[in-house]
Structures are given as structure tokens and as C-alpha cells.
Amino acid sequence: MYNPYQQQGMGYQQQQQQQQQQPNGFYPQQQQGQSSNQPQGQPQPQQQMAFNQPQATGIGGMPQSFGNSFSTMPQQPQTGYNNNGNNGSVYGNGNFGQQPQQQQQQVKPQHTGYVPNSSMPMMNTTGTMPPPNPAQQPQLQSIQPQGTGYYQSANTANVHSVQPLQSQGTGYYVSTPNLISSNQTQQPLQAQGTGYYQSQPQQVPPPQQAQSLQPLKPQQTGFYLQPQNQAPLEPLKPTATGFVNSFANNGLNNDIKIPAIRLSFITAQDQAKFETLFRSIVTNGSNTVSGANCRKILMRSGLPPSQLARIWTLCDTSKAGELLFPEFALAMHLINDVLQGDTIPYELDSKTKNEVSSFIDAINLSIANQDSSANDAPKTPFDEFITAGVQNLQPQPTGYMPQTSFGIPLQSQITGGGVASALNPQSTGFMAPTTFNMSMNTGTPGLNPQITGGAPASMQPNITGNALQPQTTGMMPQTTGMMPQTSFGVNLGPQLTGGALQSQYTGGYGSVMPQQSGPASMPNLSFNQQGLQSQLTGLQPQPTGFLPPSNFSATMPLTAQKTGFGNNEIYTKSNFGNNLIDNSSQDKISTEEKSLFYKFLKLLILKTKVVRFPHCCGNFRKSGLNRADLEQIWNLCDINNTGQLNKQEFALGMHLVYGKLNGKPIPNVLPSSLIPSSTKLLDNLKNQLKTEPTTTKEKPSFGKIDALSYKNNDDDVLPNYRNRRKVYSAKNEEQSSFSSPSAKSVNHSSSTLQTDDISVDKTVEKKTAKPKYSGFSREINLKNIASLENEIKNISNPENCYDNSIPSDLTSRFDAIIAKLPNLFNEISTIDNEITNAKIQLYRKKNPSSIIGSGPNGEITENDRKKAKSRALLRARMSALTGKSTESEDSLSMEDEQQSAEIKRIQQENGKNQEIIKDIRSSISDISASLKSTMTGSNMISNQEFERWEFGIGLEDGVREFLDDLKSNSNKSVTESSPFVPSSTPTPVDDRSSSPSYSQFKTAEERAAYLKEQAKKRMKEKLAKFDKNRRNVTQSSRSISSENSREQPQQIAGSSNLVEPRATPFQEEKYVEVAQPTQPVQSTQPVQPTQPVQPTQPVQPTQPVQNVYNAKQESDDEDEDDEEKRLQEELKRLKLKKKADKEKRLAALRKQIEDAQNESDEEETNGKDNFGGHVNVPQAAPVAPSAAFSQNSTNAPRSVHAAVTPAAGKNSTGLPSTTMGHNPYFKDASASSTSTFDARAAEMQRRIQRGLDEDEDDGWSDEDESNNRVAVDNKVEEAKIGHPDHARAPPVTAAPLPSVTPVPPAVPVPQANTSNEKSSPIPIAPIPPSVTQEPPVPLAPPLPAVDGFQEPPIPSAPAIATAVQKSGSSTPALAGGVLPPPPPLPTQQASTSEPIIAHVDNYNGAEKGTGAYGSDSDDDVLSIPESVGTDEEEEGAQPVSTAGIPSIPPAGIPPPPPLP
């Protein structure tokens, strides 16, 4: 058999002369050689050849049998497991000059590699097989084979005289020198380390220095580094996951000194992560990360290379191509910002720059300090493996630990290290019984194994190789077998065994071919020049390592899982590269270009937002491109074909121009990357709009409504105009039926309104949702507005549908108050403005300014000031010329400033008042809105909406007027819908004595029914009072009601009921009065006019009112609670009482006026007879009308009643009527002989003037609602009544009478003052104060009766005269301020018939608006004491001629005080 080792022998023998023999193994071999005193010389090769028996190398060497003599036949090579390389050395001695063929014959195959035992650490053993000398075979037979390894047999024998060889470590750690005997001159073999890292070749020192050699340290080979003190391997631990940990698992470089400085632009957590990542990629001995390593991390972010290049440019502040930690942290921070949507800054801010630079300076300073303090060279990543000798080599486990054929996984074993005594003995010579013994050629089986490595006590240490020369083993690198693939997928490099030996491959998967050693010349073989042929050995390679006994074979160590950003499958290298290539290939407009183009665009356009065609053309032509290119660029830019470009389109055009200039072709169609974002948004919006109608149409109309729960809604009509009109017509029919007199009731109609609210609201909403067409003409718009108003009016008003549980009178009161509020607030505001203007005018009057204001309301404008200054300057110049002193400009300006400041202060007060009024209005509207929502049961209305639609605030005039009309119409429709026609009520008669009044109802049931219906009627008429001319209407209605009440004085006095005035009876009565003036004057009916005088006693009306109250209470017990009943009935009682008094006074006054008109046309012959019947009527006429109309319409009736009562002391026949032109101011002399004073009338008049018994209607009561319907018509009728009397006015002032009995009350000063507060003074105040000084007929007889009454006496007498004077009549003065006596006095007063004409004139004036009771008069006017007079009254009294008026005879009452 060819032995490949034959070529090794010569190479080794040439170099073994100068080197000491070195055992290769973990522990020294126990070799049996010659005695130590054997001289060195020729026999040495023989002895060494004796050792060149087949030796088991590795752990658990195979048992070998050697014969006593070496045969020339080579034995089968026996190698350990995984013989990847020849870890042994063939010893040869070049000094003996042995034949090469001898060595070739006797050198046996050497076992290389190791077969680790499961209980021992790994070791690499090499056997030594010097070629034997045939001449020394007898001696060689006695030498026992030596096993190197762990489990060698302990049975060793000394052959012949050869002493037992000393155990020599065939590994790293040589046994201690004391094992060698003292007489040994041979130096021990130097241990050789096997593994990756070879030490420098060293010559073996001289023998005297052999004791100082340090043993080789075990070295670890492979991936999993084991500590020196090997502990049993543990299972693999899970590795940390994450982007940072994926790098950190490979190890952190903790040698980097990073100062503890905090970077403000990143968080502490981010800085810690970046530091960990930085340490994981920085190589040992460096403080910076290279560009290649940094690129691996930065590319994982997914950003395009262009952006990463910009980030690198910003971060590499030192321009060194490498990054320190602050620069690396800054790069990671910028990448995070870009991933979150931010842009890369063009340059770093100063703060960040300063932080990074200071951090770099701190790092440089720390490095300098470290270099100065370090004594040795800077550390490198390979310092721990590079040593001067072999002493620093670390133990190496070579390869993976295979699963042996014994079925027990082998533990990794450290070769070398520790004390020899601690190692387990190894059997040599025999091999443990294995299953593959048959595959080995064991040689002679008779040899006993020897214990090596343990140095047992039974054996003496044997010195081996005493005569041997120092030999070098394996100077030339040898590879036994093929170069196998290791378990890591990488070919392991050669390993030096020993000081100068190249490392040899051990372990691995590659099957080692059997090797044959034979004579061959290997002169200076270099690495990879293999001279040995690989030979297959008996053992098959198996994986080693800590793995369970399974078929699993790990090819590479586990790597950390990729987590974090950039580690998904979409960021794989293939996708990454493709995306980067695509993105880089796309043509885009960079942000730098956009900013540059936008700045340039600002120069082209200043105000407009678009670039016109001339600007662009001129700008693009400057590029020098031809016309075709420019046209193509323009067509690409002007996407919408508008002839102008916006910012983005302009930037696109500039980009294309520059691209063409740089050699890029102009695209025929814009790529998606160049389309402006605005255009993309518009296109997207267009697509959405195109697709939306289809989606809405696809939606089913009925949805998913269940058939069981579906209910058709009849009100849900289709939205076309025809159906809307049908809906409105249906609503109109409902309303017409509701407003007709045949409607069932108000409650039923209100419930109908409530049910129709929803449908009405729907139709109104549909109407408002109708689109407005601005293209219509004004006429069409007006027609549409008119039609819309009509439709709104035709819709039933749902706002009046109150809750049925709320009493109707409360709702009516609420509506009435709400109706009064707007006018009330307007009046308050107007009055406040007038007060403000009056204050300003007053201030200007008190402090006249030299500047005449020409502005509105006399305000001073700037032009006025300039004129005043110019005039002042002119005056100053003139004064300088003339020497006169004038006012300076300073005084003028100060005066102007004072005036303007005062006016401003007054206006500020007005503004504050307006704010207060506004606050009050808002609070009232808030309360009203909540009340209305409670009463109607609807949702809460906001305060602003309530003010807007109820008070009309914020609406235009036309809308406000329409709302007013709408409210008034709705109120009228409500009142007309349910008129009450009592079955037991007699129909009203047209004559004066048959107007519908409470006295017509004889029974209590009829009266109660009448009152109940009247109350309901008033509740329904609440809202009707609110209109534009409300006060005028109410005043005229009061006057008409007074005429109405005058027709039936007797019935009113007897029953004291409420009279419901009707328009038609009033008109008929007035026409009767005018047409037939002589009928009531006939002598056959003198007593009829006196009858209404008797019931004028003021005490009687309370009794019928109480009866009415009781009847009303009985009728309402079923409907209302006790508390509400009590309150309502109390209010109704008071109202009825007031109205009864009113009706009495008005009826008497009207009767007197009519009688006065009739008496003016009588003949003188009917004087006394007619006066007997009409005595009281003319007396009341002058008193009541002027007082009533000047003070209050409700004041007149009492004065009428008082005047109707005749004074005591008059004769029964009365005074004869005057024959002098029927002048009411003068009477006969015979009439002056009797007293015409009526104490009761005087007291009544006095109370009227004081406002004690008047029914003050301040706009918040409900008394005059019944008078509103006929207000306007009655106003005209009253005017008609007054006109004929006014025509007869001239005779009144023309013919004075010699004596007038009723003149004493001619002092009208107090009443004139009260009447003129809101109206112009009455110019016909007839009698001056001097008239009272003339003594009329003595009034002594009636005085005792007058004094007996309890009413206020004389001090209030002038007020009575005031009333008389205002009336313009010469009626006798009612000087007595007391109530009339209970028995009626005689009614014949001849002189009282005459003053009526004057009163009629005054009455006409009042009706015309010139009297005291004008349209602007207020019910709340305070009565001024009668003793106080005014200049206006005196002025009003002057026009009356007093010549010929006889003085009134002195009465028992002192004359009124003179005027002031």
C-alpha cells in the first residue's frame, strides 16, 4: 500500500536536528524508551523508531497491539474521529542519515483529530511515529506502544532495560518540571497548541532554559466561546428581538467611551437606543462608524438614497466619511422625522450644531486623556488572540460535538489547562470496545495499555527521549485529507500546532480519507500544496455540539429575528432595490426647485394669483428653446387649457424647461410624478362627483322597513309644485271651515291645529327650501312675495294652540301682554330719546354757544367750527384795529369742548338707559319664551328668536308689518270662529234705549250666561288690541262707549252692568240725534230726561255687580279650582264695577250732549216746561265732556251724574230758557236768583279730576277690548256729532247774557293743567277768573245739605270750575266738594240748558285732536292739585270775552283761590 507519509519523512528529518522533541497532545505521553543514560548517536533513530508504532491520537485512542518486532508491512492507519487534519507530527532525526526507505517502511499512519469522550474536555492529540531502524528491531520489540489520549490502559510494562517513559502532556499544558528526574539532560518536548491562531514560530530554547517555558493555554475554536473553567453547556437562550437588538445580539463594543451628555433634540430613550445601535456596529478599537456599516442601518429605513445622502451630508460635520455617536444620533433623528412626515432641513439650526460639535469635542478630549494614561498600545479587536508566544492562547473547542456511536452525546472538552492530577487517566494501548473495532487494524493485541496524564502513584515517572535530539514536529503545514466544509459553512483556516507549526483542520463534516504515510520528499511545501493523499478512516464524521440526540443538524447559529421599522417583507433587499431604482428613475420636482421657482414667481406676479400668458412666454423664451419645444411645454403645463398657469403649473413648466436644457427629453404625456397635486385633487373630486349620483340613486326609497311596522304617511307628499298647492288648498279648506261661524268650538279648532302642526311645518320647510332664482325680474319677485304672503296667511296659525289644561283667560292675558310689549318698549325708547334731546336743548339754552350748529338736531359739525374760528379770527383782527377786546380762540375752543363733553355725557346716559331697556326686554322675552313653550307644549324657543318674531326686533319694516297684519288677522279669525249668541239674550234694538246691556237680562241665569260669554269674548279679543294705531282706536272706542252708555242712563244706574258696545247702534243713534234735534225738547216729555239723573247715585252700582259676581261664581264652579276662581272672580268683580261706573257716566254724558243739541234748536216759549225735563242734562254737558276728554274717557260719566243731580234750592219749575240766541254762556236774570250749585256733581267732578274713581287703563287691563271693533267708525260718528254743534258755536260767544247763575265754577286752572300735559290747550275755556267775583244768586239754602256729607270739601272746588271751563259752558259751579245727598234734588234748572252748545264746540275740538283728550293722551296722567294753575290755562281763558257776563252770586262756599 502506498504510504503518503513516506514523503513526509525526509522533510522532517532535515529539520529535526536542531529542535527538541515536542509532544503533541493534551497531556504528556508515557513513552517507554531507552534509559536516560543512553548516549546520543546512531542508536537514536532505532529508539525513536521504536516509538513509531501505530499510536492512537485523540481522546479515547484506539487500543493497539504491537508486536515485538516491527514488520516492514505498513499497518492500517488509525485515526480519531473527524480527522480533518494531521494534528500529529512525524518525528525524524536528520543526524542519523537513515534511509528514506526505512522510514517509509516503518512510519505508521498517524491518528489526527480527536475523538472526545463525553466526560472529558476536548483535546487535540498528535501521535509521533519516527521511522524505525530495521537494524534495531530486537530492541524495538521490547518497547511498548504508547497511547496518547485520555482513556489509555493502565497496564504498562517496562521492556528490557528501558525505563518507563515520563508522562508527557500531548496538549497545551505540559506537566510540571519536577516530573523529570534530576539526572535528565534531555529537555522535555515543548507542547504545541492547535487551533486557529498560530503563534510566531519560535526556536526551542537551549536545555538550560527548558524549565522556564510556559505551557500553552487551551484555545477555543468555533462559534460558541467557552470559558477556561468550562461549565456544562446550557440550552440556547432566546435572543432579544428588535431592530436595535438584532445588531446588539452580535455583541456590543463597550470599550467605546461615550460621554454622558444629553442631546436635546432627541429623547432620552431614543438616545439610549441609538447608543446601543452605535456600539453594535462600531468595530473594536474605533470610535466612529464607517460609511458602509452606517449604510446598512440607514437603508433599512426605506428612504430613497437621495434623501439619505442629504441626511449624511448634514450629519457628517467633520467630512471624514465616518460618523461619531452624536452625528449618528442626529442622522437617526432626521430619519425618524422624515418617516413621520417632516422634511429634511436645508441646514441644521445653530442649537443642534452647537450640541453636536460640543459632544464631538468631549469625545475627542476623552480619547486624548485615555491615550495619555494608557501605557500599552491601543487595543484592537484581535488583541486577545495575538500573543508574543503561545501562552496567551485560549482553549478552543474545535468544531461541533458529535453524537457518537455509543448513543451518548459528547460534551465539549477543553484541551489543556488544569493540573495533571485533576485529569482523568487515559487508557493507552487498547481501545474501548466499540462497534467499529473491526474496521481498525489493531496490530499486536498483546500490549497492555498504559495510564497517561494522571501520573499514578504505582508508576514511577519515566523520562522519555533522553538520547533523542530535539526534534521539530510538523514544521511544514500538513493537511491530512481533503479540506472539509465545517458546520458553519466556511472553510476553516489552517491552524498552527505548536510554536512554529501551522494550525491543522480538526472537526467538521468533511469525511477524511484514509491516509498512508510513506517515503516521499516534501521539500518546503507551502500552504495548500498538499503532498499527502487523503485516506478514508474508519469513523464517519458526525456533528458535535450541545444538541439532543436527534437528526437535527444545525448549519449556522441562530440569528436574531428582524423587528422594528424596515424589517418587514416589503423592505427586503429585492423590493428595496427595486423601489429605489423606480423612485430614482422617476422625474420629480424637488423641493429646492419648487422654492426657487416660487420665489421667482413672486417677482412676476404681485397681486394676481395666476401667471398670464405674456409673462410665461417672455420668461420661457429666455431659455433659448425653439418654438416647438416651448409650445409642447406650455401644453403640458396648462393642464386645464385656461391660458394661464398657477404656481404649481408654473413650477412644472420651469422644471421642464430646465430639464430640456439639461438634455432630458420633453415627455409627450406628463408622468404621474409631475402632475401637480392641485390637479390630482380636482380630478379626484370630479370622479367622486361623477360617482355620487349613481350611489344615491341606487339607495332604495323604502329602505328596510318591515311590512308589519310600515305605516303610510299621507302628509308625506311628493315635492312638486302641484302637490304642494293641493296640500295648501286642503289647509285652506280646513281653515275656512274653522273660521266659519258654524265651527264647533274654539277648543276643537285648537286641537285640529295641533294635529296639523307637523304637516304645516313640513310644507313651510319645503317652501323655504325652494331655490331662489336671481334672474327673475323685480315684478316676478314681487309677485312671488305676494303669493308667498297669501299662502302663509292661508295656513292655520299653530302658535295659538295652547294646552287645554291651561285656563283660557290666562292664555288670553298672556297674549294681550305680549301684544302690548313691543309698543311699550318702543314708547319707552322714544321717550328716553326725547328726554335726551330735551336735555341737550336745555343745556344749549342755558349755555348758548357762539357756534351755530348746522348738523342734524342742531349738532355742531366740523364745518361750523371752522366758520366760528374764522369769524373769531376776523373779530380779533377787527378788535386789534379798533382797540376793542374780543374773545380769544382759546375760549372758543374751550366752550366748544365743554359743550361737546356735556352732550357726550347726556348721550352716554341715553346709551346706558337703552342698554337697561334692552336687558329688561331680553329678560322679559326669556320669561315669555319659557312660558309660551310651557303653554303650547312645544320646544323651548330661544330668546333671540322670540324677540325677533314676537317683538319684531331685527326684522325689516316690511316683514314686521306683515307679521303685525298676520297676528291681527289670526286674532280676528279666532274671534269670528266662535261667536257667542246667547239663546236667552234679546236682540238689540236700534233706538237709544235698547242697546244690549246687562240690565236687559232679568234673571240671574241670563246675566251669568251673558257675563260668561263676554269673558270668553274678551279672551279671544286679546291679540286684536295690538295694532299700529292702538291708542287712537281705544280712545275713540271709549268715546263711543260713552255715547252708548248715555242712551240708557236709567238701566245702567239700576243694574250697573257691563255694556257691550256695538258699532251699528252707535251710528244709528248719532244719525237720529242729528236728524231730529227737537224731539227730546218737547214739553210733553219733560220728565224722561230727569229719570236717568236719579240712578246716578254712585253707591248703587256695587249691589248689582255683586249679584253678577255671585252668578258668575255659580257658573264657573265646575271648571276652575277654588284659588283660581277666587282670583279670577275678584278681578272680574272689580272690572264689572269699573265698567258699570264707566257706562253710567258715559250714558249720562251722552244724554246731556244730545239734549243740549236739541235744546239749542228749541224756541224760547218752551223754556221752563222743557227745562223741567232737561235741567240736569245741560248742566252735565259742560262739565263732563271737556273734563272727560281732557283727562280720561272714563272720567266723564261721574261728572255727568253729578251734574245731572240738581242743586237744592232750585224751584220745581226750573229756570226759563234764554231767549237771546240760545247762547249757552248766558242765562236769564231770573235764573240767577236761584242757586244752581250741585254738590253731588261737584264732588263727582272733583273725584274725576283727582283720578280717584276713574278706571285707569294703563294698557295692562282688559276692560276696553270690547270697544275696539267699532273704534274707527265711532271716531267718525263722534266727529259728526260735534260738527253741528261747532256750527252753532258763534252764537255762544256773540250774545252775552246779563246774568249767568252757573258761572262760579269758571276757574278751570287745575284741570287745564292736567289736560294740557299731552295735548294742546282748549282755546274755548269760556270764563275768566274774574267772573267768580260777581255775586250770583245766593246759594245758602243747599249748603247745609252739602255740609252734611263726608266727601272732601271746598279745597277741591277749583277743579270743578276747571272742568266747567274746559267744557266751555256757563254751567253753575259745583263748588261743594262733597257727595250728593241720597234723595234726588229737583231737576228743573232753566239755566243749565244753555251752556251745552259751548260744550259741544269744545267736544268737537276734543274730537279733532285739539282738546285735552287727544290721540296722544295717556291714561296715567297724574292729577295736579286744583289750587295750582298754569300760564297755559290763563292763556286759554283770555280769548273768551267776559264783557256782559254777570258775576255769580256768592254762595256758601268761598270762592276758589286766585290764579298764581
Swiss-Prot record:
Residues 270-359, 593-681 form the EH domain. Residues 269-304, 306-338, 625-660 form the EF-hand domain. Residues 65-79, 185-197, 735-757, 1048-1058, 1210-1221 have a biased composition (Polar residues). Residues 328-672 are annotated as: 2 X 23 AA repeats of F-A-L-[AG]-M-H-L-[IV]-[NY]-[DG]-[VK]-L-[QN]-G-[DK]-[TP]-I-P-[YN]-[EV]-L-[DP]-S. Its main location: membrane. Ca(2+) binds at residues 638, 640, 642, 644, 649. Pfam families: DUF1720, EH. Phosphorylated by PRK1 on threonine residues in the L-x-x-Q-x-T-G motif of repeats 1-6 to 1-15. Phosphorylated by ARK1. It is found in: Cell membrane; Endosome membrane; Cytoplasm, Cytoskeleton, Actin patch. Sequence repeats lie at residues 142-153, 164-175, 188-199, 215-226, 235-246, 328-350, 392-403, 409-420, 422-433, 446-457, 467-478, 491-502, 503-511, 531-541, 542-549, 557-568, 650-672, 1076-1081, 1082-1087, 1088-1093, 1094-1099, 1100-1105, 1295-1300, 1301-1306, 1307-1312, 1320-1325, 1326-1330, 1335-1340, 1341-1346, 1352-1357. Residues 1-151, 185-214, 729-758, 880-901, 969-1127, 1149-1460 are annotated as: Disordered. The keyword Signal does not apply. The modification Phosphothreonine is found at residues 241, 563, 985, 987, 1301. GO terms for molecular function: actin binding; calcium ion binding. Belongs to the PAN1 family. This is Actin cytoskeleton-regulatory complex protein PAN1. The gene is PAN1.
